[in-house]
Amino acid sequence: MNPFGISCQNILQLLDIWESRLLALSEEVISNRKNIQNRSIRQILGHLFDSASNNTHRIVHLQYRENPMTFPNYATMGNNDRWIAIQDYQHENWYNLVQLWKYANLHFIHVVRNVDQTMLENQWISGEDQLISLRENIEGYLPHLQLHLAEIGELINRK
């Protein structure tokens, strides 16, 4: 039995709730309302796509590479902001970006549901003296997704 079933179900529920909510937003709301990191809703959603993509890659690598594994941590030293800028999420087609985010998460769920349970304690070196297990990586994904969706919710409700 996969220990991440509830987490996967929660991600599916968030996708169901948020896809239509995101697609209903105006251009002004998705482009001009900024969080404390000066990110628009477009940019936050792009970051969430990057998160789904990078975490999927980590899960795959952690099942076959040396342990502990060295793997780039895109979220440190401002790199996630570089990813947002280089990919120009601020000007990405909104419908396409929402679908990209949705389907990246559906694939993430598929990968998590098929993870080799014997590899859950494999680790990657995410920083100096910082090791994160495959289990911790998977368990940390949903709270990160929820944090940023709540942030988007706050921006939507800001007048």
Question: Where are the model-predicted features located?
Answer:
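Short hydrophobic/aromatic-rich motifs at helix boundaries and adjacent loops
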Residues: 1, 13-15, 27-32, 77-82, ...
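Charged, low-complexity, helix/coiled-coil-prone segments
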Residues: 1-6, 39-56, 80-98
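Alpha-helical bundle segments that constitute or directly flank the non-heme di-iron/ferroxidase center
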Residues: 1-29, 50, 54-61, 140-143
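Solvent-exposed interaction patches of small proteins and small membrane subunits
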Residues: 2-9, 65-67, 91-99, 128-129, ...
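Acidic/histidine-rich alpha-helical segments that form the ligand environment
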Residues: 10, 14, 21, 80-120
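Conserved catalytic core of Hanks-type protein kinase domains
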Residues: 24, 47, 114
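Short, contiguous alpha-helical
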Residues: 31-80, 109, 123-159
